[in-house]
């Protein structure tokens, strides 16, 4: 029997496994969503009117929350390794334990979500029949499945009067996007950015624009993705259009930009699975990347740069939400607000190391770094000073959100962008 490798230290796993596995799952989910329409969306009568005006939202919130009370229990569904852990005992989650001590709410925490597609398929029958899914709180990926949950009435509208910490400490870049319907149903859990990663030693200059990925000097040295959702949205940015407000005419213009890039021989490959290693090996010099890819690679010895181009980059967000059938929604809402305390957000960020949606967690991590030693101190200092975890105000101003697509638009979108990498 071959020897098993020694497990990496907890702090190192945070730089590799969590970041890789979570984003890998998102890539798989985005691909699945782009390739096939959601079965639930074709269920006759399944869609429900979504509150749009302030009065409609207030009425929906009142209807759901009136008479609801704390019950002292909470069932929480999440992705694997996507919350803080005790460095000495990976099965323990200190912030959950502290939450129980403070509130008396006992938490049943399960890492049962593998990807958006399989999770939706697992719980959709229960939702459709009006039954509980067994969870009061869940993390949903920021992909094309999320709007479907909202349209089908599967998420509870949030009572923001009970979320004072979110109001006070939630970063402005993470609020009120059309993709999440203005936080009516969700608040961010963790986030990340999509931009350009490049090797300055290979490129020989700074990259500042999506147009730099049309530079003839980079022929055969650019990496792009076989992911219609991300590819189409960044191409919209490249042609100067905010994805959230884009039209079908804008999509055609973006697809033309991508075809120009492809036909000029600039792209070595379209892949969401190999671009990281290709960039580190020097097979490609510049690529579409997630911000965390560069943070991870540089902690491992690479000297890559990440840039949010002047035309803008994408901010993606995984979201906390409450199922409309939750048995303990007040307890879930209590935890939502608790997670937005800077000291709690800091502890979670120190483990998962994604973009933190609570900017005031940054000085907390800096203080924790001062109190730590060795590798732990080095890690926490890197986290507290990295614009890949705490984006600068200038970078935040350039971040945009994904375009929300209805069922008809999704088919039109895929018809334009999938052939770019399939042909």
Where are these regions (language model features)?
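A structural signal for short loop-to-beta-strand junctions that line the ligand-binding cleft
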Residues: 65, 131-138, 156-195, 221
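Mature extracytoplasmic/periplasmic domains
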Residues: 323-396
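Conserved C-terminal helix/tail region of periplasmic/extracytoplasmic solute-binding proteins
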Residues: 388-423
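N-terminal secretory signal peptides
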Residues: 1-20, 31-37
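Bacterial lipoprotein signal-peptidase II cleavage site
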Residues: 42-49
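Ligand-binding "clamshell"
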Residues: 149-157, 181-183, 296-308, 375
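Ligand-binding pocket segment of bilobal, Venus flytrap-like solute-binding proteins
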Residues: 146-147, 223-227, 231, 235, ...
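Early extracytoplasmic/lumenal segment of secretory-pathway proteins
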Residues: 57-144
